[in-house]
């Protein structure tokens, strides 16, 4: 039945994804709502809220503010807060309320810029899409607003450029708050410095994005931003997840029929890791509840028929019942959906699905 959920909780909406991208960058994040969306973001969708400080606010819209379009009140609140906080920028993030009343985000951005000394960006999310769509919009808005040509990069060749940029690092996508440190170590062991935008690295690194020798896309939501940086600065990008090897336990995968359920980049990185270990192209299907990008399949040389989009719980249940898999990689909360499965179930935690981080 369409929309029926018996096992999975509702996935995080787009405004949560936008907050996740901007959370660690030192800005003032104003969620344009009455308070409910902000409560969900801080209470459920952003695990760093309990460990790391960030200036996340609700606009506190009242009924008549929304009905009469009193943007001036939001501007006044934000300007007052900006005077009391040590922040580097302000971001206004949309929800269903401004979507319904047709808020003009460009006008709002101009009004806020005049009232404060801060750079202001807006993310036109509406609460109707999933978290990854909000991430995609936020990454693009972030690099469009703050990345600029660094004079140092003009005379550099790729070997001289100081770092690798990692785009797509959010808890929703990588499900591990230590993943950024692990990735930095992976590249440090190769004599390179990795910058994980939005997870341990701040706004200055975004401003210096032109210095990157290469960008690594670790989630589908980051692809548009990487393409933008390639167009603007000529920075090449690759699609990969550097920690894929730690997600694949030492098991005999030879000749097995395998299903991997995750976000598209990690799922296909796990596929490649398995094929690397077996030395063969195994019968592997990847599936995701979230966005799919044809460019990712083309880049990784994966047939589109082997990459499935799941929309309903029944899609996953039917896929398992009808295709006879020997091994399934998926979030542990999905195991109860397939009690008749007799093969091997390997936990592959996805915070966006279960709200749980990797142990």
Predicted regions located by residue number:
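An N-terminal assembly and electron-transfer interface module characteristic of large anaerobic redox
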Residues: 1-359
């Amino acid at each position: 039945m369409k929309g029926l959920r018996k096992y999975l909780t509702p996935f995080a909406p787009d405004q949560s994804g936008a907050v996740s991208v901007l959370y660690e960058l030192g800005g003032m994040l104003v969620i344009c709502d009455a308070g409910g969306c902000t409560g969900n973001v801080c209470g459920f969708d952003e695990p760093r809220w309990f460990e790391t400080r960030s200036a996340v606010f609700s606009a506190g819209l009242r009924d008549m503010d929304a009905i009469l379009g009193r943007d001036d009140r939001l501007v006044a609140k934000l300007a007052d807060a900006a005077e009391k906080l040590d922040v580097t920028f302000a971001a206004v993030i949309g929800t269903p309320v401004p979507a319904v009343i047709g808020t003009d985000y460009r006008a709002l951005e101009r009004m806020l810029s005049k009232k404060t000394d801060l750079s202001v960006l807006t993310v036109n999310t509406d609460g109707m899409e999933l978290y990854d769509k909000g991430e995609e919009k936020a990454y693009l808005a972030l690099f469009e607003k703050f990345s600029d040509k660094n004079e140092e990069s003009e005379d550099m060749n790729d070997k001289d450029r100081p770092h690798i940029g990692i785009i797509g690092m959010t808890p929703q996508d990588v499900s591990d708050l230590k993943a950024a440190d692990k990735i930095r170590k992976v590249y440090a062991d190769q004599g390179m410095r990795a910058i994980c935008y939005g997870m341990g690295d701040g706004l200055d690194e975004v401003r210096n994005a032109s210095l990157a020798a290469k960008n690594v896309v670790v989630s589908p939501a980051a692809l548009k931003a990487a393409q933008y940086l390639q167009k603007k600065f000529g920075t090449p990008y690759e699609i990969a997840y550097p920690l894929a090897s730690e997600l694949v336990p030492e098991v005999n995968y030879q000749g097995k029929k395998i299903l991997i359920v995750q976000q598209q980049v990690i799922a296909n990185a796990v596929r490649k890791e398995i094929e690397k270990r077996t030395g063969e192209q195994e019968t592997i299907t990847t599936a995701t509840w979230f966005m799919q990008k044809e460019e990712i399949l083309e880049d990784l040389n994966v047939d589109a028929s082997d990459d499935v989009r799941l929309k309903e719980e029944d899609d996953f249940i039917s896929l398992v019942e009808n295709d006879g898999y020997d091994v399934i990689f998926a979030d542990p909360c999905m195991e109860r959906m397939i009690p008749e499965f007799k093969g091997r179930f390997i936990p592959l935690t996805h915070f966006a699905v279960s709200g749980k981080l990797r142990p």
